[in-house]
Amino acid sequence: MADAWEEIRRLAADFQRAQFAEATQRLSERNCIEIVNKLIAQKQLEVVHTLDGKEYITPAQISKEMRDELHVRGGRVNIVDLQQAINVDLTHIENRIGDIVKSEKHVQLVLGQLIDENYLDRLAEEVNDKLQESGQVTIAELCKTYDLPGNFLTQALTQRLGRIINGHIDLDNRGVIFTEAFVSRHKARIRGLFSAITRPTAVNSLISRYGFQEQLLYSVLEELVNDGRLRGTVVGGRQDKAVFIPDIYSRTQSTWVDSFLRQNGYLEFDALSRLGIPDAMSYIKKRYKTTQLLFLKAACVGQGLVDQVEASVEEAISSGTWVDIAPLLPSSLSVEDAAILLQHVMRALSKQASAVVFSDTIVVSEKFINDCTDLFSELMHQKAEKEMKNNPVHLITEEDLKQISILESINTSKKDKKDERRRKATEGSGSVRGGGGSNAREYKIKKTKKKGRKDDDSDDESSHTGKKKPEITFMFQDEIEDFLRKHLQDAPEEFISELAEYLIKPLNKTYLEVVHSVYMSSTSSASGTGRKRTIKDLQEEVSNLYNNIRLFEKGMKFFTDDTQAALTKHLLKTVCTDITNLVFNFLASDLMMAVDDPATITSEVRKKILSKLSEETKVALTKLHNSLNEKSIEDFLACLDSAAEACDIMLKKGDKKRERQVLFQHRQALVEQLKVTEDPALTLHLTSVLLFQFSTHSMLHAPGRCVPQIIAFLSSKIPEDQHALLVKYQGLVVKHLVSQNKKTGQGEDPLSDELDKEQEDIINTTRKELQELSSSIKDLVLKSRKSSVTEE
C-alpha cells in the first residue's frame, strides 16, 4: 500500500512540474519550406536549393565547391561535370563561373571548360617532352590530343616558350613549334641541297622528295638567300610553282641571250622560254632597257636587221622592182612576224602610195605594177579588134566607163578605210604591229577562188550603181597568171597569183576603154561603107520572118492545147526572138551600138538599148521585148506591128502565091538537110516535120521534144505500114539515147565492167538497126512522096 502511495506522489510531482514548466515550439518540414521560399521571394535570404529539393546551398558555397572541384580534377573541369557534382541547376553554375573568372585571373573558360594556369603549365611540360623527342610539334596535332582550340593553344604555348618549352615557333607559320636542334639540322640540309643546284628547280618537288617541312623550308631558304649564303633567287613566292634559280644559271642564261642577240640580231620568245625564262618579253625589256628593239608577236629583232630590210625595200622601190624580205630574215621568224616587221619598215619610209605589199612579205613598187600592166597593152588591142567582129562589146558606152570609174573609186576608198581601221587597231594594241600606213597598200586575196571568175565584191558594188557592170572580161585570173609566169621567171607562185588577182580590175577597166576606142574608130570609118543596115533590107527580112511566123502559127493549130503551148514557146524563143533582134539592132545602129550578128543580142543587151531610146520608141519596143516572155503568138505579132510602126518599118503581108513559095522553099530546105544528115534523132525529126507538111500543107516549127506528138498526129494521115515504121524508128532512137546516157552516167567502178559490156552490146545493136532503117525512113519523104504527093 505504501508503494502505491509512493507512486501516486511521484506522478503528482511530475504533473506539477509539467504544469509549471515552459512549452518548446516545433515547425513541420512543409512550414519550414514555405517560410524559406517567402524569405527568398522578399530577398531577405539568398540560397539555392539542390536538384533533389532536400537541401539549400548559398552562392558562396557553390563557388567554394566549384574551386574545390577544379583543384581536385587537376585544373580542368567541364561545367556539366560541375553541375552533376554540386547537384544544382546548370544556370547557377554558369552564373558563378563569370564571378570566378573575374576574381581569379589564373582561371579561364574555354569551350565550356574551366582551365587554370597549373593545368596549362603541366600541358606545356608534356608538349616540351614531345618536342624534345621529335624535334617539332604542330598545333593541329595538339588540338586533336588535348581537345582544345588552336588559337588558345597557340597563345598559351607561346607564353611558355623559353620558360617551360625549349623551342621556338615559326613566325610565318605559327602552327608549328621547332627545337633549335631541329631547325639547325634542317637548315644544314637545305643549305647543302640548294648549294648543289645548278639549274632552275621546282621547290615543291624537293619538298616531296626530301621530306622537308614546307613552311620551315621557305623560311630558311629565304633567310639563306637574303644573307647571301645561297646565290640565287626564288621565283613564284611560297606557292606550288615556286622555282629556285641559282645565280650561276642566271649568269649563263644571260650570257647566252646576249651572245645570241649580238650574233643573230633577234631573239625568239620560245627559245627564252625553253631556257627557263617564263616571261620572255618582260625579261628582254628589263635587260635591254637602252637597246632599240622591235617587238613582234613571237620574237624581237634588233635595229641592224630592221635597217637591212629597210635598205632592201628602199632599193626595190627606187629601182622599180620587187623584193621578198622573207629570205633576208631568219628562217625561224614566222610569216606573221615578217609582216609586222615589214609594216614597221614601210611606215618609216614615208613614201606615200609608192608600193604594194603582197603575201605579207613581198614589196612591189608601183612602177613595177605599171610595167606589168603595160605588158598586156598589145594583147588588149589584138583582142579588142577580134571582139569587135564576134561579140557585142561596143555596147559599152561612155556612161558604162563612167560607172566603172565610180566603182574603182569606191573600192579604193573602201580599201583605204579598211587599212586605216586596221592601222589604228593594231597601233592601239601596244606593240609595233601597224599596217602599211599611208605609204603602202597591203593586198590579200581569198585562196578558195583562185581563178577569180566571180568577184567577191560584185554584190557590194552593184548596190552602189544599181546596174550590172558590162559582161566583158579581158582575161581571167588563171590566164593572167600564165601570162605573168612567162615574164616573171623567179617570182613565187603565191605572189604571181595575188598579183594576177590585183591586176584583174585595172586590166578589165583599161580593156573596156580600149574596146570603146576601137569601136569608136571603126564606126567612124565604116559609116560610109554600108555597115549600117538599110531600111529596105530590114523591111524585106522582117516581112519574110513575119509571114513565116504566120504560117508556123497555122500549123500549130492541128495539135492539142498542151502541144500548142510547147510549140508557141519554142517559136517565141527562136524566130520571134530573131525578128525582135533585127528591129533592136536597126535602132542600135543609130546609137552607134549595132552588132554584126543580131543573133548575139541577149535580153540584157536589149534592155541596154531600150535605156538609150526616146520615150516614144521605148514604149512600143518594151512591149515587144516583154511579149517574148508571154504565151501568145497573136500578142507578139500585135506588139511587132506597133513596134514596126514606131520605127517606120513597113511590113509586107503575104498573099496565097507568096505562101506557096514559102512552103516550097521551106520543104526544099528540110529535104536538103535530111539528105545529108546521119544523126538518127535529126533524121526522125526532119522526116516527121516533112510528113506533117505533106499531109496538112502547113509549115511546122517544132522542138525535138514535140516529135512524139507529131508522129501521133500522123497516124491518121499516112499509111499504117509507114506509121508503124516511123514508130519503130522512134523507139530505136529513144533506146539509143537512153543507152548512151546510162553509159555516160556510169563511173569507173570495177563491179560495173560487166554491165558496161552489156550496155555496149545494146548500143551497138541499136545503132546497127538504126542504120538499116535510116534509108527507109528517109525514103518515106524522098521517094514515095514523089509519086503520091505533088506540090508546087
From Swiss-Prot:
GO biological process: DNA damage checkpoint signaling; DNA damage response; DNA repair; erythrocyte differentiation; hematopoietic stem cell differentiation; negative regulation of IRE1-mediated unfolded protein response; negative regulation of NF-kappaB transcription factor activity; negative regulation of protein ubiquitination
Key words, A-Z: Acetylation, Chromosome, Cytoplasm, DNA damage, DNA repair, Endoplasmic reticulum, Membrane, Methylation, Nucleus, Phosphoprotein, Transferase, Ubl conjugation, Ubl conjugation pathway
Region (Involved in CDK5RAP3-binding) location: 121-250
Region (Disordered): 412-471
UniProt-annotated location(s): Endoplasmic reticulum membrane; Cytoplasm, Cytosol; Nucleus; Chromosome
Chief location: endoplasmic reticulum
Phosphothreonine PTM positions: T534
One GO cellular component term noted in the UniProt record for this chain: endoplasmic reticulum
Region annotated Mediates interaction with DDRGK1, chain positions: 2-200
Documented EC number(s): 2.3.2.-
Entry-annotated residues carrying Phosphoserine: S458, S752
Induction per the UniProt record: Expressed in response to endoplasmic reticulum stress. By lipopolysaccharide (LPS).
Modified residues (N-acetylalanine): A2
Region (Mediates interaction with TRIP4): 200-400
Annotated stretches, region: Required for E3 UFM1-protein ligase activity: 2-212
Residue ranges, annotated region (Mediates interaction with CDK5RAP3): 488-682
Pfam (any one): UFL1_C
Source organism superkingdom: Eukaryota
Residue stretches of biased makeup (Basic and acidic residues): 453-471
InterPro entries xref list: Ufl1, Ufl1-like_C, Ufl1_dom, Ufl1_N
Post-translational modification: Ubiquitinated, leading to its degradation by the proteasome. Interaction with CDK5RAP3 protects both proteins against ubiquitination and degradation via the proteasome. Phosphorylation at Thr-534 by AMPK promotes its interaction with YWHAG/14-3-3-gamma, thereby preventing UFL1 association with PDCD1/PD-1 substrate.
Subunit: Catalytic component of the UFM1 ribosome E3 ligase (UREL) complex, composed of UFL1, DDRGK1 and CDK5RAP3. Interacts with E2-like enzyme UFC1. Interacts with RELA. Interacts with NBN; promoting recruitment to double-strand breaks following DNA damage. Interacts (when phosphorylated) with YWHAG/14-3-3-gamma; sequestering UFL1 and preventing its association with PDCD1/PD-1 substrate.
Function text: E3 protein ligase that mediates ufmylation, the covalent attachment of the ubiquitin-like modifier UFM1 to lysine residues on target proteins, and which plays a key role in various processes, such as ribosome recycling, response to DNA damage, interferon response or reticulophagy (also called ER-phagy). Catalyzes ufmylation of many protein, such as CD274/PD-L1, CDK5RAP3, CYB5R3, DDRGK1, EIF6, histone H4, MRE11, P4HB, PDCD1/PD-1, TRIP4, RPN1, RPS20/uS10, RPL10/uL16, RPL26/uL24, SYVN1/HRD1 and TP53/p53.
Name of the protein in its database record: E3 UFM1-protein ligase 1
Organism: Bos taurus (Bovine)
Annotated gene: UFL1
